[in-house]
C-alpha cells in the first residue's frame, strides 16, 4: 500500500512539474507543420474563445504562440496540427529572438476573431471558389452574402470581405462566345437580371456598379477586402466605368457608349489605372490589366512567382500578408492570372511578382482607413481550372503555400494595431 502511495506521489509530482513547465503552445509554420491550413482555423477558434495569440512574423514560417490551455491542446490534437508544448523560459527566449533588432522578425498580437463575409451567389456555378474551400477546410466560420445584402447595408456588420470569380462589369465573365447556349449561362443571366429588377436597377451592370461602389466605401471606412481572379480586375474596371457603358448589347440590351474608353475615371479605382477595356463580347478578356503567361511558361513545372521580403518591424502589414514556409510559389492560371505592372497605381505595394518583374501576382494597398488585397489566379492547387472541373480536395494539399496566402488575409484584420514607427 505504501509502495503504491509513493508511486502515485511521484507520478503526480512529475505531472505537476511538466504542467508547470508547459506554459505556452507553439504552432510551428515551417516545413515541419503537418497541416498549415487547419492551423489558421485553430488560431481563429482560439481567438473566438477569448484568448490572444501571438503571430511570430518570419519565425519558422510565421508561427503562432499562445498561452497553454487544455482546450486548445485538445483542438490541436483533433485537427491533426503539429504543435509543441514549451515552458516559460523557452517562450521568452523565442520572443527575445523575434524582437531582437538584429533579426527581421516581430511579434503581432491577434486579439479578436474577424467577422468574415464571402461575396458569392447562392446559384451553383460550374467552378470552385478557392476562399470558400480554404475557409471550409480550415474550419473558419463565415457568412455568405451577395448583391441584396450589400445594397441593403449589411456589409458594415463584417470586418473582412472576400470576392472571387465575380464580374462587376455585368458581362457574366465574358463567357458569351463559348457558353452563351449552355444551360448554366442562360440561368445565370436570367437570375442576375431578375435580381437587378427586384433591387430597383434597370440592368445588371448598374446593380454591380452599385455593389462595387458600396464595397469601395466600406474599405474607405476601415474594412478589409480580399479579391481573387476576375473579382479583382473587374472590380476596378466597373468603378472606372461609372460614367459610361462598356457592356455590349448581348449583355445589357443596349449599345456601348461610343467614347467609352475615354470616359473611364481612374481616380476612383483602387489598384489599377490607365488600362484599356475590351468591349468585344466575343473576346474572353476584360482589359489589358491581365497578362496571360507566354505559351512556353503555361506549365505548372515552369510557372512560378516570388514573394517579396519586408521589414517585419517597420512594415508589419505586407509582412503578415506574405508569411509562408516557402519564398517561391507555383503559379496558377485564372481569368485574371497576373497583373501588368505598368497598370498598377504607385500607392499599391507589390507582394509577389513573376520572373522578369513585369507582371504581378499578389498586391495590396491602403484606401482610406482600410486595406485591399488582390491575388491573381483561380485555384492555387489546380493550374488550369476549367469550367465544369470538380473542386480541389484540400485534404490533399494541407500545406499549400498558395492557399496560405489566402488565409494570411483572414487573420490580418485580427491584428492589434501598432503605432507607426517614425
Predicted ranges, named:
Residues 99-104, 148-150, 357-361:
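Alpha-helical scaffolding within the catalytic cores
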Residues 129, 136, 233, 263-385:
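Catalytic beta-strand/loop cores that center a nucleophilic Ser/Cys/Thr
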Residues 23-65, 245, 343-422:
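Extracellular ligand-binding/catalytic regions of CAZymes and related secreted enzymes
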Residues 22-129, 138:
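Hydrophobic targeting/anchoring helices
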Amino acid at each position: 500500500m505504501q509502495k503504491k502511495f509513493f508511486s502515485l506521489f511521484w507520478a503526480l509530482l512529475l505531472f505537476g512539474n511538466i504542467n508547470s513547465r508547459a506554459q505556452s503552445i507553439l504552432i510551428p509554420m515551417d516545413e515541419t507543420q503537418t497541416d498549415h491550413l487547419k492551423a489558421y482555423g485553430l488560431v481563429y477558434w482560439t481567438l473566438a474563445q477569448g484568448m490572444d495569440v501571438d503571430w511570430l512574423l518570419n519565425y519558422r514560417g510565421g508561427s503562432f504562440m499562445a498561452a497553454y490551455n487544455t482546450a486548445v491542446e485538445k483542438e490541436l490534437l483533433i485537427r491533426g496540427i503539429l504543435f509543441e508544448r514549451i515552458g516559460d523560459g523557452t517562450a521568452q527566449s523565442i520572443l527575445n529572438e523575434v524582437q531582437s533588432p538584429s533579426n527581421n522578425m516581430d511579434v503581432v498580437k491577434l486579439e479578436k476573431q474577424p467577422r468574415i463575409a464571402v461575396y458569392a451567389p447562392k446559384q451553383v456555378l460550374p467552378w470552385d471558389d478557392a476562399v470558400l474551400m480554404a475557409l471550409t477546410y480550415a474550419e473558419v466560420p463565415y457568412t455568405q452574402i451577395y448583391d441584396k445584402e450589400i445594397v441593403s447595408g449589411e456589409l458594415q456588420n463584417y470586418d473582412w470581405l472576400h470576392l472571387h470569380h465575380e464580374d462587376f462589369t455585368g458581362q457574366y465573365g465574358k463567357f458569351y462566345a463559348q457558353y452563351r447556349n449552355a444551360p448554366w449561362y442562360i440561368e445565370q443571366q436570367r437570375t442576375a437580371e431578375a435580381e437587378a429588377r427586384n433591387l430597383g436597377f434597370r440592368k445588371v451592370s448598374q446593380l454591380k456598379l452599385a455593389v462595387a461602389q458600396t464595397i469601395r466605401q466600406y474599405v474607405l471606412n476601415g474594412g478589409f477586402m480580399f479579391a481573387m481572379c476576375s473579382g479583382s480586375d473587374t472590380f476596378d474596371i466597373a468603378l472606372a466605368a461609372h460614367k459610361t457603358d462598356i457592356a455590349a448589347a448581348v449583355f445589357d440590351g443596349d449599345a456601348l457608349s461610343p467614347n467609352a474608353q475615354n470616359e473611364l475615371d481612374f481616380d476612383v479605382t483602387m489598384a489599377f489605372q490607365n488600362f484599356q477595356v475590351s468591349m468585344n463580347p466575343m473576346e474572353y478578356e476584360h482589359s489589358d490589366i491581365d497578362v496571360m503567361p507566354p505559351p512556353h511558361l503555361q506549365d505548372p513545372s515552369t510557372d512560378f512567382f516570388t514573394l517579396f521580403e519586408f521589414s517585419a518591424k517597420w512594415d508589419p502589414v505586407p509582412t503578415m500578408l506574405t508569411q509562408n514556409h516557402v519564398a517561391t510559389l507555383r503559379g496558377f492560371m485564372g481569368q485574371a492570372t497576373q497583373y501588368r505592372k505598368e497598370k498598377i497605381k504607385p500607392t499599391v505595394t507589390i507582394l509577389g511578382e513573376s520572373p522578369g518583374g513585369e507582371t504581378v501576382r499578389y498586391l495590396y494597398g491602403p484606401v482610406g482607413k482600410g486595406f485591399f488585397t488582390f491575388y491573381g489566379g483561380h485555384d492555387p492547387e489546380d493550374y488550369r481550372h476549367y469550367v465544369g472541373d470538380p473542386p480541389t480536395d484540400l485534404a490533399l494539399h494541407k500545406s499549400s503555400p498558395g492557399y496560405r496566402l489566402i488565409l494570411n488575409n483572414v487573420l490580418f484584420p485580427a491584428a492589434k494595431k501598432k503605432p507607426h514607427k517614425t
